[in-house]
């Protein structure tokens, strides 16, 4: 039955989407994700240092195909519930899944150290399992995975890259936080008010550019707890601030204040070369690793125009599939009931990835 692998991939894709959104999985569909799995917390050495990671393994398939799933900018790292649910669902489809922790991104720093960890993780998993591995990166991790795949050192270890809600050019994303707009490749403009989260991550990463050096140690915990969305801890951290520090912290948290916007613009100018080093833009025209691009139409942290720019730059032989979907926001499924066609397009896109991941 030549059509069965594609049919199975579509059933698995539908089941995975149901599982991660907390919806019941129909019995006939659930059989496609019925492999019992085990998890194992591990560490492995790399040139980037010891990497903490978790393996999700289908118990009855010791030689199953492989997939790395990279977490986004979140303090829970590989323990973030959406990530663990997705990794477990993919493993139940018969994939060996590795989720390496990216210490920089876990601490709200998008930097070159994470590119190194991503490349080293792909190399370690490829050597352990005997062949190149698929790599799925969420949010900024997806863009960094593309940079790692373009590195000649790590390129042979990448089977494909799936970038979900990821950046093409960091300076464009930083400018979006200032303006709520971004130009698309076709000349139209994406207009969507930016979520505060993206600007807050920039502030946290470059706090020395926003407050005096003497105030950094006191203000950073306030900003950190605000990013964690822990209001009680944020209030507790504010107690130790003096009046000047309290005013500085509140100004930072108000990402639309004129003073904060001026500082954000200054940071974009000051760190432009660093941002270029964290951007797939300029590296994609010669990339030969197969690429899948997925973005939420309503993404207000990294705008969907970023995926359109990546698709515009990638060679046609490299770009396997691209979808900007109204079913997704940033990394979450939208709460509103999607249309049947939009839901099917997302299922089909994920099925293409499942089929690629399942090929040894």
Region spans (language model):
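Short beta-strand immediately N-terminal to the catalytic nucleophile in serine-hydrolase-like folds
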Residues: 135-138, 162-164, 294
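Catalytic nucleophile-loop/oxyanion-hole region of alpha/beta-hydrolase
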Residues: 78-86, 99-134, 149-152
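N-terminal cap/lid segment of alpha/beta-hydrolase-fold proteins
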Residues: 14-62
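Short, surface-exposed "cap/lid" segments of acyl-processing enzymes
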Residues: 59-90, 101-102
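C-terminal catalytic histidine-bearing segment of alpha/beta-hydrolase fold enzymes
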Residues: 175, 237-276, 281, 308-312, ...
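Gly/Ala-rich beta-loop-alpha elbow adjacent to hydrolase catalytic centers
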Residues: 137-145
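Short beta-strand/loop motif that positions the catalytic acidic residue
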Residues: 287, 293-295, 299
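Alpha/beta-hydrolase-fold enzymes
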Residues: 147-241
């Amino acid at each position: 039955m030549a059509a069965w692998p594609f049919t199975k991939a579509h059933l698995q894709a539908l089941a995975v989407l149901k599982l991660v959104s907390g919806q019941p999985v129909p019995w006939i569909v659930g059989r496609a994700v019925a492999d019992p799995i085990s998890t194992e917390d591990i560490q492995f050495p790399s040139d980037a240092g010891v990497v903490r990671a978790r393996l999700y393994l289908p118990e009855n398939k010791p030689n199953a195909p492989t997939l790395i799933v990279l977490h986004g900018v979140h303090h829970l790292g590989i323990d973030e519930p959406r990530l663990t649910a997705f990794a477990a669902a993919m493993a139940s489809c018969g994939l060996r899944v590795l989720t390496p922790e990216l210490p920089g991104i876990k601490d709200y720093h998008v930097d070159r150290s994470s590119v190194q960890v991503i490349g080293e993780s792909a190399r370690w998993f490829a050597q352990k399992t005997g062949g190149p591995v698929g790599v799925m990166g969420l949010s900024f991790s997806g863009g960094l995975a593309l940079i790692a795949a373009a590195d000649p050192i790590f390129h042979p270890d990448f089977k494909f890259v799936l970038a979900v809600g990821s950046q093409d050019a960091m300076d464009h994303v930083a400018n979006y936080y200032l303006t709520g707009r971004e130009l698309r490749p076709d000349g139209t403009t994406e207009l969507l008010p930016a979520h505060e989260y993206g600007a807050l991550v920039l502030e946290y990463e470059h706090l020395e550019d926003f407050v005096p050096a003497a105030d950094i140690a006191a203000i950073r915990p306030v900003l950190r707890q605000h990013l964690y969305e822990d209001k009680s801890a944020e209030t507790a951290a504010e107690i130790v601030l003096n009046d000047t520090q309290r005013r500085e912290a509140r100004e930072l948290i108000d990402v639309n204040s004129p003073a904060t916007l001026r500082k954000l613009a200054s940071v974009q100018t000051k760190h432009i070369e660093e941002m270029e080093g964290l951007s797939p833009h300029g590296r994609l025209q010669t990339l030969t690793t197969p690429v899948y691009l997925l973005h939420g139409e309503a993404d207000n942290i990294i705008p969907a125009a970023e995926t359109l720019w990546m698709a515009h730059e990638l060679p046609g032989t490299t770009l396997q599939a691209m979808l900007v979907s109204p079913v997704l926001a940033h990394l979450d499924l939208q709460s509103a009931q999607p249309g049947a066609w939009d839901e099917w397009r997302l299922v089909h896109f994920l099925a293409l990835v499942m089929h690629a991941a399942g090929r040894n």
